[in-house]
Amino acid sequence: SEKYGIKGAMVSAVDLTKGLGIYIGMEILNVPGVTGYLDTNYVGKAEYSLEALERVDLVYIHVEAPDEASHAGNYKDKIKAIEDFDALVVGTVLRGIKAFEDYRVLVMPDHPTPIEVRTHTDEPVPFVIYDSREKKNNKGAVFSEEILNAEGVVKIQHGHELMDYFIRG
């Protein structure tokens, strides 16, 4: 909050992540049923986050289920976790956030955890940012490694630089 002059909140089932949020002055949203696994309360995370945006400028929603499925080496659970995250968190947020005048949404994993190795790796992390003020129409756009490596795609060299890019544009 000091660096950017904004207030933030976060929701996570992971104590380490919540501790980091507390350390930087974020409000911790205590959502019932948040587990860090496939049975987590995805919709609750999104709804509590949207409600928090009435009083804070930024909400960080951490979802652990895809990472846990990767550590277990379970590709079916990882697919389910990503699909649930997309439909129940991202979908809920994108529908609800339209009530706000201007907004930006950043979606990304916190780190890669390939199923093949069952641990975190240091590959680049893909991200997508939606800015309601931009009038580009990318409806139906798809993701591929080829697109990710294309000329003109924003690449952030160091992870700590992403927040500057997201906040300041």
Predicted regions and their residues:
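Feature captures the catalytic ectodomains and active-site-proximal regions of enzymes
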Residues: S1-G169
